[in-house]
Amino acid sequence: MSGSNGPTDTHTYQSLAEDCPFGSVEQPKRSTGRLVMHSMAMFGREFCYAVEAAYVTPVLLSVGLPKSLYSMVWLLSPILGFLLQPVVGSASDHCRARWGRRRPYILTLAIMMLLGMALYLNGDAVVSALVANPRQKLIWAISITMVGVVLFDFSADFIDGPIKAYLFDVCSHQDKEKGLHYHALFTGFGGALGYILGAIDWVHLDLGRLLGTEFQVMFFFSALVLILCFITHLCSIPEAPLRDAATDPPSQQDPQGSSLSASGMHEYGSIEKVKNGGADTEQPVQEWKNKKPSGQSQRTMSMKSLLRALVNMPSHYRCLCVSHLIGWTAFLSNMLFFTDFMGQIVYHGDPYGAHNSTEFLIYERGVEVGCWGLCINSVFSSVYSYFQKAMVSYIGLKGLYFMGYLLFGLGTGFIGLFPNVYSTLVLCSMFGVMSSTLYTVPFNLIAEYHREEEKEKGQEAPGGPDNQGRGKGVDCAALTCMVQLAQILVGGGLGFLVNMAGSVVVVVITASAVSLIGCCFVALFVRYVD
């Protein structure tokens, strides 16, 4: 701090997307209750995901969707997400809404999720009530259901990036780690509850008779859980709005020269001025005038500059994205086909047999048991997430990352080699280890990278090189993009492998092989901050 006759230091607290010559200020400590409230978004999201996993195939079959359109349903959403995630991530970095940068996007995507569920779970019933012509009814039912599935998948995949960026914006480094563990914990709880409710035969219960069909029952529960969870999430931690440092000079933003409050939201773009009665107020204004063009150029991000920021991201970010892609490719390869694997390989059923045949009924039984296996996965994911907090102090993030990939690779390998009912259900717990790992460790590493960069920025002279337009939203979105890319790879390539091999056992073998390759990658190429 300078004396009373010198210029006042002007501290600008900005995200990684902007020049931050004096570093960033640590956020205040958040209570466990606030972090749990923040994590409810993951509970609601995963609950709805589980309902979709249990019901989307029966819904698509019931409306008569042609097999030729199946691939379009499953590929359209991840393709859209892969293309748009970084754009929206960058837009949220520069959002100037009064109630924050991330929450407007989270609210919009939650509404889109609700609309998507309403369309794919109720579309057929609505069309049946409004359209009499059988041909038009078929066309409208298929169209509305497809739109609903794509809209829900797109929104549910998309929303993870803004939720993580919101957590990173409002929490200290220690609270980020705790928050990510709570996210994984409630992700498991939400998935388990969704799978359990999806396994109940609602048709023969009073609620099923009251609402009409099991599809309407599940929409009722899904809408209720989603609305309550996201209201809780959006009210969890106050988010400071982005101030316009390019149009509001420091003297206007804080005419009294007061520092930011402790509760305060050391927000992106805000100004702190040191209390000093003899400070020269002309100096900060002059500095603001000199920096104004730079600030404007930083906030204006074209598609070209965004792509350049992603292409030129540091190598350790790229390696983390590749490892995330490998992990999700292995995980989705197994999860998307697991119930079919249980029905065909473990139970030796026939999905193409007559619906009243013994082989088909055996297949259905295998699918039901497979759903319970996925429930075991969700429960164990929550349990493992709880113990992760203790384990990280002993084996570090590298050990957690490596162990998650290794256990999943070994577990799926044993399932493929020895397809027994009981051993398969026990080994479903390894899916939970991988799920928890994918939801926590990569984002913990992103938080570590951000903290390291902020420390380096604090040691640089003013006017040093910036991060080429990259912000926390862009980094989280780039990581989340890998989930969509993995879906594209799995949806486009795994069916081809199954057709070539003539058996779905190739699915779990592929998942095992990819995961073990990922073990080597996370050990050799991913950078870990000491």
Swiss-Prot record:
GO BP terms, alphabetized: developmental pigmentation; lysosomal lumen pH elevation; melanin biosynthetic process from tyrosine; sucrose transport; visual perception
Cellular localisation: Melanosome membrane
Coiled-coil parts of chain: none
InterPro entries: MFS, MFS_trans_sf
Cytoplasmic-side segments: 1-45, 90-105, 160-184, 238-318, 388-398, 447-477, 526-530
GO MF terms, alphabetically ordered: D-glucose:proton symporter activity; sucrose:proton symporter activity
Topology within the bilayer: Multi-pass membrane protein
pH dependence: Optimum pH is 5.7.
Catalytic activity: sucrose(out) + H(+)(out) = sucrose(in) + H(+)(in); D-glucose(out) + H(+)(out) = D-glucose(in) + H(+)(in)
Disruption phenotype: Mutant mice have clear white fur with red and transparent eyes without melanin in the retinal pigment epithelium chorioid.
Tissue expr: Mainly expressed in eyeballs and skin melanocytes. Also detected in kidney, colon, gall bladder and pancreas.
Glycosites: N356
Extracellular side: 67-68, 127-138, 206-216, 340-366, 420-425, 499-504
TM annotation in the entry: 46-66, 69-89, 106-126, 139-159, 185-205, 217-237, 319-339, 367-387, 399-419, 426-446, 478-498, 505-525
Family per record: Belongs to the glycoside-pentoside-hexuronide (GPH) cation symporter transporter (TC 2.A.2) family.
PANTHER family, per database record: MEMBRANE-ASSOCIATED TRANSPORTER PROTEIN, SUGAR TRANSPORTER
Noted disease: Defects in Slc45a2 are the cause of the UW-dbr phenotype that results in loss of nearly all pigmentation in the homozygous state.
Assembly and interaction partners: Interacts with TYRP1.
Role of this protein: Proton-associated glucose and sucrose transporter. May be able to transport also fructose. Expressed at a late melanosome maturation stage where functions as a proton/glucose exporter which increase lumenal pH by decreasing glycolysis. Regulates melanogenesis by maintaining melanosome neutralization that is initially initiated by transient OCA2 and required for a proper function of the tyrosinase TYR.
Protein name (database record): Membrane-associated transporter protein
Organism field: Mus musculus
